[in-house]
Amino acid sequence: MSNNQILFERAQKTIPGGVNSPVRAFRSVGGTPRFVARAQGPYFWDADGKQYIDYIGSWGPMIVGHVHPEVLSAVQNVLADGFSFGAPTEAEIEIAEEICKLVPSIEQVRMVSSGTEATMSALRLARGFTGRSRIVKFEGCYHGHADSLLVKAGSGLLTFGNPTSAGVPADIAKHTTVLEYNNVAALEEAFGAFGDEIAAVIVEPVAGNMNLVRGTPEFLNALRALCMKHGAVLIFDEVMCGFRVALGGAQAYYGIAADLTCLGKVIGGGMPAAAFGGRRDIMAHLAPLGGVYQAGTLSGNPIAVAAGLKTLQLIQAPGFYDALTAQTKRLADGLAAEARAAGVPFAADSIGAMFGLYFAERVPGSFAEVTKSDVERFNRFFHLMLDEGVYFAPSAYEAGFVSSTHDDAVIDATLAAARRAFAALAA
């Protein structure tokens, strides 16, 4: 029995499912999760000492690679000063200034500890600002595990949303309307039917939790216009795509300014940190200035802020995103070429340092299209690549991530492994 298997059996005795976040359990793909012992650059090593090329990177934060020496040094420099204070620090101001500089639509920002906290707080703020209750979200977009966001579409536009998790009361779910991603007609119909009830529309401008699906410019511009027309707050959930698809996030990529933005992952540099921010007039409704309450013992934690601030400084290096985007595109295009050569139906896409792999004839544009991919074939591919020492997301419904340490040699090794994996799939 491998050390991974021993640890997984042991973990299941004291941790539900043996993991602290469901996707880690390998339920979608089968098999035994890899327990990470250490990581460096584009690699990690599991409990059995096997090395893997890592295309998850902690689900996005590790944009400069694992244990970057400057990030490590920044963390080490603050450790001796104290782990947590529950009081303001100068470093909190510095990271807030950096975020506001890089994302111009954010005039003020509040630090939190997780993406779920960021989206949950942004929605409460939008409701407090507008005095309205209804939230609009989109099928396939994931915004954390707050009750009002674990909702799927009803049978028609005017029906109440339905909970997607046990423990979410129907009375909460009914305030959330779920529409099809990238469907402008459905969006216009919804605003026409109850536009004056909508407090906020929350959207991943580049979705990463139904695999990678890009928002179309037409869809995102329609969102911006309709929210402005009806007085609803437009919330861009950039927890995943913020500082991933471009230096200024998806807003810089598309040239669209949100009213509120949720950030996470990259801004913590691998530490637990997230944030939400936006227009000053909206943020002024937060306590202690306004009546919308939000708080957190570990918000602005000095160690997390040190890692995040250094990461934000590193990604501003000239040419950083050009090189990262080119490497990610080389990976996606190369995988598609290897599949084509083997005669395996497959498509791939990339934007910035995010990529998606689809066992389908073309790149999907909605959750419904994603679900038509061949999941069984993806699962086989996943395990073939895992055996080769390449670690992709253990689910057909997750995006992948490239770091600045994924150099040509790493991409070449990945494509060589994929050539063998696709050949096995085609056999």
From Swiss-Prot:
Main location: cytoplasm
Superkingdom of the source species: Bacteria
UniProt modified residues of type N6-(pyridoxal phosphate)lysine: K265
Enzyme nomenclature, EC number: 5.4.3.8
Reactions catalysed: (S)-4-amino-5-oxopentanoate = 5-aminolevulinate
Compartment list: Cytoplasm
Entries under Gene3D superfamilies matching the protein: Aspartate Aminotransferase, domain 1, Type I PLP-dependent aspartate aminotransferase-like (Major domain)
A Pfam family it matches: Aminotran_3
Cofactor(s) of this protein: pyridoxal 5'-phosphate
Involved pathway(s): Porphyrin-containing compound metabolism; protoporphyrin-IX biosynthesis; 5-aminolevulinate from L-glutamyl-tRNA(Glu): step 2/2
Keyword annotations: Cytoplasm, Isomerase, Porphyrin biosynthesis, Pyridoxal phosphate
HAMAP family according to UniProt: HemL_aminotrans_3
Oligomer and partners: Homodimer.
NCBIfam families the UniProt entry points to: hemL, PRK00062.1
Protein name, entry field: Glutamate-1-semialdehyde 2,1-aminomutase
Gene: hemL
